[in-house]
């Protein structure tokens, strides 16, 4: 992952301003340690910190069209760049970068090209001919992007809020699937898939087609000019990613460059469930497996760094980010710069165990839609920033646009958990890859029940965090929590401890408003809490202690007050109930 910073329309154009923007851009250097770039045009600045994955020798940014009148700074990967280049026969490309195509697409089609991109991205593009600019973010929000406003009327964009929080009067999370245009002065949605309407589809389940689409999603993410691997926890999602990647490795140029042995990575406390399961999958797939251990104390020691990089105080996100943060450092030390991961499956297919209680297929579908729409606030945020903290890029095939469209078009009746029919969570994916003739995985792995990542690395991890924070936060501090933190008040000592660190690092009102909050049980949205009466009374941050599922489905997922309420969810030009100084046209 790269880091981008754009500042447009500043009042002061001086050497001091240029130096300040370079200084702020350096706050993103962990995301892109390979090279730094800056383009200045009058009162507009586009900065870039590069992590070189494609065309390491000539793909430095910012990137340009032929006459350098169009400038773009990009964080992301465009998987269909070769196909798009073929449509631009009259254009001359200067580099082998997959992202250069964005400048030429704008030149050819104007602002209406973003839905042509297949990939993960956030970018800012400046047209120097009239000083207009656009900014856009990928469909689901895999790549982070923040937008801010300076007192001088300047507009700011950054991959992480740490690069703009000190200089902007106000800033927000840039919404996924949106484009900002300076010509209209507002945001508009470019990604409008049928499932956004939450209308219940009736398409029958086609196991082979679903398998084919997922394999295509994994294969396109093997596009790389640097060493890579797969994050393997031993659960269904990461195991399927590893299996497909291993099976198709010899069809790509990766095989010729780095060999035909897939590298896999796992982290956990000694004796943790993930380590054992991942080792078994790695042995089955004959991967080059790397197993990392950490202690509870090492995780606790990293908490402040984790909160600084992830930019959240959400309890569940911090719990899961810490092992991933530690693992990414180890991965980078091996010379690996890109990994493929399994985020998104649970949201698409209702894989969290609380989905056992969905009363009907309509509510099941609506909950999956809500979960996908909020991924950029949780798992995408974690996966991207925990890896980017050490200059590693994470790719997520489950969040492929085409795959999501196919998966969300299946009649949700097929996703409902029905034990009398032998259907457990994510049954449609398990069945799609249940191939006796050419097995992808052993049966017991294919049908292994889900572990929350923060539990899978070792149950003592969460217990250790709770014990540690219990000692750091007094009862008196909790009694005054509402006075100290009137916005999103912490409901337990672990949440209070993380909030203290966050407020010290990011004291701005806008910063705390980027973190969603609200009632949640086992990672549910507030609406799903209505499914079970007992859930409404719980604020225990660990789903391990909630008897909300039948005995065959003991949930190890987390419980917290972590979801955006209606007042906290960006919509119709408001964020957390306050006006955003741009209109949003949906």
UniProtKB/Swiss-Prot annotation:
Site (Important for beta-aspartyl-AMP intermediate formation): 343
Glutamine amidotransferase type-2 domain location: 2-185
Binding positions (ATP): 231, 267, 341-342
Pathway: Amino-acid biosynthesis; L-asparagine biosynthesis; L-asparagine from L-aspartate (L-Gln route): step 1/1
SUPFAM superfamilies: Adenine nucleotide alpha hydrolases-like (SSF52402), N-terminal nucleophile aminohydrolases (Ntn hydrolases) (SSF56235)
Segments forming domain Asparagine synthetase: 193-516
Designated name of the protein: Asparagine synthetase [glutamine-hydrolyzing]
Organism the protein comes from: Zea mays (Maize)
């Amino acid at each position: 992952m790269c880091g981008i910073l754009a500042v447009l329309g500043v009042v002061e154009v001086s050497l001091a301003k240029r130096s300040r923007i370079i200084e702020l851009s350096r706050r993103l250097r962990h995301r892109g340690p390979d090279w730094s770039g800056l383009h200045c045009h009058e009162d507009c600045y586009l900065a870039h910190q590069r992590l070189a994955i494609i065309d390491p020798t000539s793909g430095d940014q910012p990137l340009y069209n032929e006459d350098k009148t169009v400038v773009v700074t990009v964080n992301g990967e465009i998987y269909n760049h070769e196909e798009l280049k073929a449509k631009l026969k009259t254009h001359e490309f200067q580099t082998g970068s997959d992202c250069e195509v964005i400048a030429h697409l704008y030149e050819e089609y104007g602002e209406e090209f973003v839905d042509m991109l297949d990939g993960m991205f956030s970018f800012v593009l400046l047209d120097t001919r009239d000083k207009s600019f656009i900014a856009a973010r990928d469909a689901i929000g895999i790549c982070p992007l923040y937008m801010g406003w300076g007192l001088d009327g300047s507009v700011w964009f950054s991959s992480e809020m740490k690069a703009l929080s000190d200089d902007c009067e106000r800033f927000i999370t840039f919404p996924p699937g949106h484009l900002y245009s300076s010509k209209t002065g507002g945001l508009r949605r470019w990604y409008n898939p049928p499932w956004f309407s939450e209308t219940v589809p009736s398409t029958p389940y086609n196991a082979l087609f679903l398998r084919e689409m997922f394999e295509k999603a994994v294969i396109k993410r093997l596009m790389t000019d640097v060493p890579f691997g797969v994050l393997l926890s031993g659960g269904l999602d990461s195991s399927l990613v590893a299996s497909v990647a291993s099976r198709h490795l010899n069809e790509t140029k990766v095989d010729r460059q780095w060999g035909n042995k897939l590298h896999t990575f796992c982290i956990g406390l000694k004796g943790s469930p993930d380590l054992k399961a991942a080792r078994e999958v790695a042995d089955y797939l004959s991967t080059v497996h790397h197993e990392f251990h950490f202690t509870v104390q090492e995780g606790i020691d990293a908490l402040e760094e984790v909160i600084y990089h992830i930019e959240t105080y959400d309890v569940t996100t911090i719990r899961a980010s810490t092992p991933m943060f530690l693992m990414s450092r180890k991965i980078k030390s091996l010379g690996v710069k890109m990994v493929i991961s399994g985020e998104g499956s649970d949201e698409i297919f209702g894989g969290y165990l609380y989905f056992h209680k969905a009363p009907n297929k309509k509510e099941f579908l609506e909950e999956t839609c809500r979960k996908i729409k909020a991924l950029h606030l949780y798992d995408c945020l974690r996966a991207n920033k925990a890896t980017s903290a050490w200059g590693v890029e994470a790719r997520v095939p489950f969040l492929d646009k085409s795959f999501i469209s196919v998966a969300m078009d299946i009649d949700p009746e097929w996703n409902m958990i029905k034990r009398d029919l032998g259907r457990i969570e994510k049954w449609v994916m398990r069945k799609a890859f249940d191939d006796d003739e050419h097995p992808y995985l052993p049966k017991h792995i294919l049908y292994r029940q889900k572990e929350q990542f923060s539990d899978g690395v070792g149950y003592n991890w969460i217990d250790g965090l709770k014990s540690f924070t219990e000692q750091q936060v007094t009862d008196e501090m909790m009694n005054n929590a509402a006075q100290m933190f009137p916005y999103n008040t912490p409901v337990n000592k672990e949440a209070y401890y993380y909030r203290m660190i966050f407020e010290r690092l990011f004291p701005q009102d806008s910063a705390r408003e980027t973190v969603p909050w609200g009632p949640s049980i086992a990672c549910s949205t507030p609406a799903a809490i209505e499914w079970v009466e007992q859930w409404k009374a719980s604020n225990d941050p660990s789903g391990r202690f909630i008897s909300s599922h039948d005995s065959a489905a003991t949930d190890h997922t987390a419980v917290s007050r972590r979801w955006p309420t209606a007042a906290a969810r960006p919509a119709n030009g408001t964020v957390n109930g306050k006006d955003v100084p741009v209109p949003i046209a949906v």
